[in-house]
């Protein structure tokens, strides 16, 4: 049975035809029926399935719909049409640290995130040292996260999500975290998770990274499925299309 099943999925957004400067202006125009919208389809009738243990990349130019698809699979959004079925626990690495309480320390946020993911304190006690070790944040573990750099927040988020293992890891451009050495640590950890049977769904503009991590690539172009197959073949076709200006 597929671990991810996407059937005839479309995602529609309503975009305002004119820009409003303030929330008050937007509300007044909306109530007076003076605000008009254009329909925009980020995805149109996309279907595919992913088997347990597969490593799959979603590729495409900016605005192609790949990140929207990842958010639908992660349950962050719901499709306008069609269905998305996920048969397993998913760890979404879409906006690292988005679930943190900025007033709390790293220590407190580790336990908070663990609770959100359904793990009790005893479980998080067992994994706490590994999380902080990997994130390299022992010197700042009791400092409020609001004082962290964006890179430190991202490191903590990646460490929590990948230490507390899930069936599916859904990643959006996350290997740009920190310096080169930390990026390599992230890459190695993802390789370990793949070896352990975790299913990977990966969004990236780095074609070389896609080829290294993923055996399969799904190419989304202007909201449509344009290619699906071995990552090297699909990536080469995508690059060739970009070079032709398509």
Residue ranges and their predicted role:
Residues 222-223, 238:
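Conserved ABC ATPase "signature" C-loop
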Residues 59-61:
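The feature captures the beta-strand-to-loop junction immediately N-terminal to the Walker
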Residues 210-212:
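A short, surface-exposed alpha-helical micro-motif characterized by mixed small hydrophobic
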Residues 2-42, 231-246:
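Pre-NBD coupling/linker segments of ABC/ABC-like ATPases
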Residues 204-205:
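H-loop/switch region of ABC-family ATPase nucleotide-binding domains
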Residues 24-31, 111, 123-140:
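Conserved ABC ATPase "signature" region
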